[in-house]
Amino acid sequence: MVKSHIGSWILVLFVAMWSDVGLCKKRPKPGGGWNTGGSRYPGQGSPGGNRYPPQGGGGWGQPHGGGWGQPHGGGWGQPHGGGWGQPHGGGGWGQGGTHSQWNKPSKPKTNMKHVAGAAAAGAVVGGLGGYMLGSAMNRPLIHFGNDYEDRYYRENMYRYPNQVYYRPVDQYNNQNTFVHDCVNITVKQHTVTTTTKGENFTETDIKMMERVVEQMCITQYQRESQAYYQRGASVILFSSPPVILLISFLIFLIVG
């Protein structure tokens, strides 16, 4: 009796296991089958996915949610949601929507070498043999000894330069040679430039211009001399043996 019950239970378990295996074989795999998103070639594309996965709810002939002949949700002849001749997102002809605008010329890239070269050149003026152009100054108030010239200067001072040309101060022995060279090149350059524009200077203009430029050249020399001595003092300070020893000790403490 007991043996018959054991045999019955074994038979029931065998049938149950066989049925479960059969159901597993018949159950469709997720995303498999023809036109169900499964990959017929597992070696191509991601595992379990189709080479061309559907993008949202389209029926037969309606991939990506569009109607017949309307891929990606666009109308007839409107691929990717754009109008006729407007591919990929509704951009106008030659715009390309969200894709690259092939019809638009690319912006020129800034050449950093040119920028750095211009910054390093500073105020060096081309065509004047290494002269530099100083910063703009207010034209000085000068009295020429008589009312006529004083009035003439006030009425025409805007015609005279407010910047001077000069060389570095270390190329001169003293202030007088610097100022003399500065006045000559500045007056000459301003006269030539203004004459080419159709404006001429009288002897009175030249006299007043030389006085004005002389005062500005003296101011420019004082500025350049002060800056030159400050740079020299900094070099001497940092090149002295005690300072070098102190800096080396600090670097040793930081690195160590």
UniProtKB/Swiss-Prot annotation:
Q: What processes in GO biological process is this protein linked to?
A: protein homooligomerization
Interaction with GRB2, ERI3 and SYN1: where is this region? Answer: 25-233
Q: Which SMART domains match?
A: PRP (SM00157)
Q: Propeptide residue ranges?
A: 234-256
| Coarse class of the protein's main subcellular location | membrane
A GO-annotated cellular component: Golgi apparatus
Query: Which residues have a glycan attached per UniProt?
Result: 184, 200
Q: Which residues form a coiled coil?
A: none
What are this entry's molecular-function GO terms?
copper ion binding
Q: How does it sit in the membrane?
A: Lipid-anchor; GPI-anchor
Segments of this protein annotated with the region 5 X 8 AA tandem repeats of P-H-G-G-G-W-G-Q: 54-95
Q: Which cysteines are joined by disulfide bonds?
A: 182-217
- Print the keywords alphabetically: Amyloid, Cell membrane, Copper, Disulfide bond, Glycoprotein, Golgi apparatus, GPI-anchor, Lipoprotein, Membrane, Metal-binding, Prion, Repeat, Signal, Zinc
Quick one: which residues bind Cu(2+) 2?
Answer: 72-74
PROSITE patterns assigned = PRION_1, PRION_2
Q: What quaternary structure, including any partners, is listed in this protein's UniProt entry?
A: Monomer and homodimer. Has a tendency to aggregate into amyloid fibrils containing a cross-beta spine, formed by a steric zipper of superposed beta-strands. Soluble oligomers may represent an intermediate stage on the path to fibril formation. Copper binding may promote oligomerization. Interacts with GRB2, APP, ERI3/PRNPIP and SYN1. Mislocalized cytosolically exposed PrP interacts with MGRN1; this interaction alters MGRN1 subcellular location and causes lysosomal enlargement. Interacts with KIAA1191.
Similarity comment: family membership: Belongs to the prion family.
What does this protein do, in the record's words? Its primary physiological function is unclear. Has cytoprotective activity against internal or environmental stresses. May play a role in neuronal development and synaptic plasticity. May be required for neuronal myelin sheath maintenance. May play a role in iron uptake and iron homeostasis. Soluble oligomers are toxic to cultured neuroblastoma cells and induce apoptosis (in vitro). Association with GPC1 (via its heparan sulfate chains) targets PRNP to lipid rafts. Also provides Cu(2+) or Zn(2+) for the ascorbate-mediated GPC1 deaminase degradation of its heparan sulfate side chains.
Domain-related comment:
The normal, monomeric form has a mainly alpha-helical structure. The disease-associated, protease-resistant form forms amyloid fibrils containing a cross-beta spine, formed by a steric zipper of superposed beta-strands. Disease mutations may favor intermolecular contacts via short beta strands, and may thereby trigger oligomerization. Contains an N-terminal region composed of octamer repeats. At low copper concentrations, the sidechains of His residues from three or four repeats contribute to the binding of a single copper ion. Alternatively, a copper ion can be bound by interaction with the sidechain and backbone amide nitrogen of a single His residue. The observed copper binding stoichiometry suggests that two repeat regions cooperate to stabilize the binding of a single copper ion. At higher copper concentrations, each octamer can bind one copper ion by interactions with the His sidechain and Gly backbone atoms.
Spell out the protein name for this chain. Answer: Major prion protein
- Which organism's genome codes for this protein? Odocoileus hemionus (Mule deer)
Q: What is the lineage of its organism?
A: Eukaryota, Metazoa, Chordata, Craniata, Vertebrata
